[in-house]
């Protein structure tokens, strides 16, 4: 079982762009970050820090293009600022709502949490990756974004909005509401 522990933060913008950043504090690859970017035309781009991580993520999820680029990050308790050669972005979130039981079985995540995750956030906590592996998203804390700003190639993307339409990177999209989620991804 491979476990990735970190934070996924996401939202859409008036431009139609949707951005997801994963900041992984612990993983089989050590600490790293990746960006999933859905353009208004539906094109899906993965920005990864190196080819090994890019190939691994691409084996799990669907992308039209993989870019290898430095992802520069500054983070505090409730804010992330990051940039690549194309993207500049800042996410800020508010109160974090914790899940009361941290160590819960994966069967619970794939049944009870799956039901409530879909009902409330329109997201799935369990499914199969592109290459057929089983994956669980174990949410530890969730919070609504209170501000987000982004530029692509120097052009502002406008006001932050819900993550819509779905990007279909994998079996689940992030919450439809602009959100930051402390999460553990288990991949079998």
Describe the residue ranges of each PLM region:
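Short amphipathic beta-strand and strand-loop transition segments with alternating hydrophobic
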Residues: 21-23, 69-73
């Amino acid at each position: 079982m491979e476990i990735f522990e970190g934070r996924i933060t996401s939202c859409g913008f008036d431009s139609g762009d949707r951005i997801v950043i994963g900041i992984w504090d612990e993983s089989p690859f050590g600490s790293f970050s990746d960006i999933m970017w859905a353009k208004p035309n539906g094109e899906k781009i993965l920005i990864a820090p190196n080819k090994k991580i890019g190939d691994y993520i691409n084996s799990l999820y669907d992308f039209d293009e993989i870019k290898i680029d430095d992802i520069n990050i500054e983070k505090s308790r409730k804010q992330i600022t990051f940039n690549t050669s194309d993207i500049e972005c800042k996410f800020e979130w508010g109160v974090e709502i914790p899940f009361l039981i941290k160590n819960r079985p994966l069967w619970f995540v794939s049944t009870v949490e799956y039901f409530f995750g879909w009902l409330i956030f329109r997201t799935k906590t369990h499914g199969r990756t592109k290459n057929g592996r089983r994956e669980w998203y174990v949410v530890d804390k969730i919070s609504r974004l209170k501000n987000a700003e982004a530029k692509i190639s120097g052009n502002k993307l406008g006001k932050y909005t819900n993550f819509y339409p779905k990007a279909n990177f994998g079996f689940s999209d992030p919450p439809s509401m602009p959100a930051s989620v402390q999460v553990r991804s288990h991949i079998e």
